[in-house]
Swiss-Prot record:
Designated name of the protein: Kunitz-like toxin PcKuz2
Compartments where located: Secreted; Nematocyst
Keywords annotated in UniProt: Disulfide bond, Nematocyst, Protease inhibitor, Secreted, Serine protease inhibitor
Main subcellular localisation: secreted
Disulfide bonds: C1-C51, C10-C34, C26-C47
Gene3D superfamilies listed in its UniProt record: Pancreatic trypsin inhibitor Kunitz domain (4.10.410.10)
Organism lineage string: Eukaryota, Metazoa, Cnidaria, Anthozoa, Hexacorallia
SMART domains: KU
Cellular component, GO annotation: extracellular space; nematocyst
Residues in the signal sequence: none
The species this protein was found in: Palythoa caribaeorum (White encrusting zoanthid coral)
CDD domains linked to this entry: Kunitz-type
Job of this protein: Weak serine protease inhibitor that has been tested on both trypsin and elastase. In vivo, is not lethal to zebrafish larvae.
GO MF, one annotated term: serine-type endopeptidase inhibitor activity
UniProt xrefs under PROSITE patterns: BPTI_KUNITZ_1, BPTI_KUNITZ_2
Length: 51
């Protein structure tokens, strides 16, 4: 949860959630569909329960 979100480099854009450790909250970002890191969640609830 402390690493920055990684949008990846593919073209299958989808909204995902990541934990922003600077703001101390889960936020959305556009994920490309590949190249994810562990700070990548399908829902806000999943992000909040993990981080």
């Amino acid at each position: 949860c402390k690493i920055p979100a990684n949008a990846g480099n593919c073209n299958n854009h989808q909204e995902r959630w990541f934990y922003n450790s600077h703001n101390r909250k889960c936020e959305t970002f556009l994920y490309s569909g590949c190249g994810a890191n562990p700070n990548n969640f399908k829902s806000e609830k999943q992000c909040e329960s993990t981080c």
